Amino acid sequence: MIRLTLAALLVATPAAAADMAFFVKNLRAQGVAVELFSRDSDKVWPGGNKVFFIRPKAQKSVPISCTPGERICWGAWVDGNDQISAGVGPDNDQPCDNCCFICTEHSTETIDLVQ
């Protein structure tokens, strides 16, 4: 009976979240806003209509919790002008070949925002 209970708990336990980070380097002369979007769910980081703001010529480490194996894409745009954007853009609707990463425990991915 105990084995059945343990087996049921193992099956019912959701996948543990992975903690990873994105190291964002803003090489632009303007401040930029950045959001991270899951391609496997409706999750957005930081969420709640907020953004990660990176000052001009600055860098920031952005820690997140995600589901291992989840595909995460970044979108960035000049603060105050979302017509100048990179990655998947502010609405997560732009094509992009190199702006997505796989959620992996204890990993750090680098995003370079250039002119």
Tell where the protein language model's regions lie, with residue ranges:
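N-terminal signal peptide c-region/cleavage motif recognized by signal peptidases
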Residues: 12-14
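Intrinsically disordered, low-complexity segments enriched in small/polar residues
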Residues: 17-66, 75-115
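Exposed beta-strand face motif in extracellular beta-rich ectodomains
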Residues: 70-72
